[in-house]
């Protein structure tokens, strides 16, 4: 009986120390901890990579055209309406204030 107990104890001890199914099944808390750490790291990465307001990831021909269109619209607006600050400046000129 003692021999059986010693052998079973040694077998369980060996299985625990070497990678195997029993060791994996008994390592549930460690794997949960790794999962939680992974989720915390993922949250931190996504928090650091947040984009500022108004940022567009779209680049290329159409993006530069839309920027060009904005400047043309601003020029047309300044040519038609007087200065916003004093309403006395001539259209198209920069305000001195």
UniProtKB/Swiss-Prot annotation:
One of its GO terms (biological process) is negative regulation of smooth muscle contraction. The keyword Glycosyltransferase does not apply. Residues 1-23 form the signal peptide. It is found in: Secreted. Expressed by the skin glands. Pfam families: Bradykinin (PF06753). GO terms for molecular function: hormone activity; toxin activity. InterPro entries: Bradykinin. Its main location: secreted. Keywords: Amphibian defense peptide, Cleavage on pair of basic residues, G-protein coupled receptor impairing toxin, Repeat, Secreted, Signal, Toxin, Vasoactive, Vasodilator. GO terms for cellular component: extracellular region. [Ala3,Thr6]bradykinin: produces in vitro relaxation of rat arterial smooth muscle and constriction of intestinal smooth muscle. Possesses insulin-releasing activity. May target bradykinin receptors (BDKRB). Belongs to the bradykinin-related peptide family. This is Kininogen-1.
């Amino acid at each position: 009986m003692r021999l059986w107990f010693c052998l079973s104890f040694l077998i369980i001890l060996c299985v625990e120390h070497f990678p195997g199914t029993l060791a994996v099944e008994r390592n549930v808390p460690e794997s949960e901890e790794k999962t939680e750490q992974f989720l915390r790291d993922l949250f931190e990465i996504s928090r650091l990579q947040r984009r500022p307001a108004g940022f567009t990831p779209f680049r290329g021909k159409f993006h530069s055209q839309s920027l060009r269109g904005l400047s043309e619209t601003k020029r047309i607006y300044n040519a038609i309406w007087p200065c916003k600050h004093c309403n006395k400046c001539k259209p198209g000129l920069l305000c001195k204030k």
